[in-house]
Regions:
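Extended catalytic cores of very large enzyme megasubunits
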Residues: 1-168
Length: 168
């Protein structure tokens, strides 16, 4: 099925999901079905059955491939957060939320390009002198992609407000 052993190894290592109930990894046709099932789940009637059949056959024949990140993540991971299906993204770093979004996107495995052009960065507020002493607040970080991204937003917001935080 695969052109060589290296291609099969890469498929098994990277794209073939473990099937707990069967105690084994997916085979290529099962990976394709997982991908197709996810497409149908998200698009329903928008994709004609004739087109679905063509996609399935072309993938079985290695004539066409989706984004490999999409193939890798189709199913529960992409249902939880579709950011994981993308290869790359871009944002202008002109607000606190952009920094948190950057971390979240990177933690999903998606590349992140950004602009730090002066006309964009100048939209960020100035960082005042940090207050010291009793103004320190303790912040606990939820150990998840969302938790870490939120912590960046909390940190940057506190800096712009002149607060000093302690991250636990």
């Amino acid at each position: 099925m695969f052109k060589n052993e290296v291609a099969e190894f890469i498929y098994k290592r990277t794209y073939s999901r473990w099937m707990e109930d069967e105690g084994r990894r997916e085979e290529w046709p099962e990976t394709i079905e997982r991908f197709i099932d996810f497409l149908i789940l998200k698009n329903g009637e928008k994709i004609p059955e004739k087109t679905v059949k063509k996609i399935r056959q072309y993938m079985l024949d290695f004539a066409v491939m989706p984004s490999m990140r999409f193939l890798w993540s189709a199913g529960p991971a992409a249902e939880k957060d579709n950011t994981v299906i993308y290869n790359c993204s871009f944002a202008k770093l002109n607000c606190v939320e952009a920094f948190a979004e950057c971390l979240h996107i990177l933690m999903c495995g998606t590349g992140f390009g950004f602009s730090v052009e002066e006309d964009e960065v100048s939209k960020l507020p100035s960082i005042p002198e940090i207050k010291s002493g009793k103004d320190i607040a303790r912040v606990t970080i939820d150990d998840s992609r969302e938790g870490w991204a939120d912590s960046v937003k909390t940190l940057m917001t506190s800096l712009y407000e002149g607060q000093n935080l302690y991250f636990d």
